[in-house]
Amino acid sequence: MDFNVKKLASDAGVFFSRAMQFTEEKLGQAEKTELDAHFENLLARADSTKNWTEKILRQTEVLLQPNPSARVEEFLYEKLDRKVPSRVTNGELLAQYMTEAANDFGPGTPYGKTLIKVGETQRRLGAAERDFIHSASINFLTPLRNFLEGDWRTISKERRILQNRRLDLDACKARLKKAKAAEAKAAAVPDFQETRPRNYVLSASASALWSDEVEKAEHELRLTQTEFDRQAEVTRLLLEGISSTHVNHLRCLHEFVESQTNYYAQCYQYMLDLQKQLGRFSGTFVGNAESTSPPPAAASPPAVAATTLPAVPTIPVVPTIVGVPNTVAESVLNPNEVKPPASGTRKARVLYDYEAADSTELALLADEMITVYSLPGMDPDWLIGERGNQKGKVPVTYLELLS
C-alpha cells in the first residue's frame, strides 16, 4: 500500500509538471523542443492518410449499402462479434415480385412470360450485386478498417507517449535553467558593507544547495533526453511504415476495381441476354395480339397470310467494293452457302455458353475455340462462326478474339 501511495504521488507530480509545461507553452512563457522537418512531414503524411482513409471507407460503405439503417445494423453486429445476417438485395426482391405477378397473371400470357424472364434477370443481377459487395468488403473495406483500428491506434499511442516525453524534457530544461540562474546568483561575491556576516553564511550554504540542485537537474535531463530520443525513433519507424500502408491500399484498390469491373460486365451481359430474349418474344406477342382479332373482310388472302406468318430473321448484305452503290438488300442467311472471305479468318475463344435462337445461329459452349469471320454488310455485333462442319451466326460479345 505504501508503494502504491508513493507511485500515485509520483504520477501526480509528473502530471502536474506536464500540465504546467503545456500551459506555459501555450501562453508563450516556456521554450518548446521542435522536431526536425522530416519528422514533421511524416506526422503530416500520417494524419492525411488517416483522414482520407476514413472518408474513403465511409463513402465506400455508402456506395455498397445506401441504406443507413442497414449500415448501423451491420456495425452493431460487427461490434458484438456476431455474423451479419444475409440480406435480400433489391434486385432479388424485385425478381420475387415479378415472378409472383407472372404466376398471378398467368405464366403462359405474353405479359407473364416477359415478367418471368425479366424477373430471372433481376435475380441474377441481385446475386451479382451480392457477390460484388462481399468481394469489396473483404478485399477493400477490411484492409482500410484494419489500418484505422490497428496500425493507426498504435501510431497514435506512440505519438502521445512522445508528446509526454517532450513535455518532460522541456520541463527538465526549464528546471535546469532556473537552478543555474539561482546558483549564479548565490555564488555572486556579496558586498560586506551591506551584508551582515550571518547572511553571508546563509548565502554560502544556499550556493552549495543550488550546486547540488544543478547536478540533479542535469542528471534528470540526460535521462529524459535519452527516453525522448528512444521514443522519437520508435515513432519515426512507425510513421515511415505509412509508405507500406500506401502500397497495401494500392493493391486493395486494384482488387476493388477488378471486382467492380467484373460486376458491371456481368450486369451488362445479363441485360444483353435479356434484350435478345425479349426481342424474340416481341414478334410472338404481336402475332398473338393480332391473331385475336379477325382480319378485315376486304383484305386479300396474301395480305391475311402476311399478317399471320412469323417474321423471318434476315441479315443485311452491303457491298463494300469501291464505286458500287451502297444499297442494302435483305437476304436469308443459309449457313451451308456461307464461305470464308478471301481476307482470311480468326480464332476466337468462347466466353459464355450461348443457345442458338434458330437454325441460322451457332450454339456455343464456354472456353471452346472456334473460327470466325465477317461478311460484307453484316451487323457488326455478329460474326460467322465455324466449328467443324457446323456454321452459323455468333454474337461478338460472347467471344474473345485471338490474334
Curated annotation (Swiss-Prot):
Organism: Gallus gallus (Chicken)
GO cellular component, one term: cytoplasm
Entry annotated with the keyword Heme: no
Membrane-spanning segments: none
Entry keyword annotation includes Electron transport: no
GO biological process, one term: membrane organization
Compartments where found: Cytoplasm
Coiled coil: 210-233
Family: Belongs to the endophilin family.
Keyword field: Coiled coil, Cytoplasm, SH3 domain
SMART domains recorded: BAR (SM00721), SH3 (SM00326)
Disulfide feature: none
Stretches assigned to the BAR domain: 24-287
A family per Pfam: BAR
Span list, region Membrane-binding amphipathic helix: 1-27
Subunit structure: Homodimer, and heterodimer with SH3GLB1.
Principal location class: cytoplasm
PROSITE patterns referenced in this protein's UniProt entry, alphabetically: BAR (PS51021), SH3 (PS50002)
SH3 domain ranges (all copies): 343-403
Protein name as catalogued: Endophilin-B2
Highest taxon in the source lineage: Eukaryota
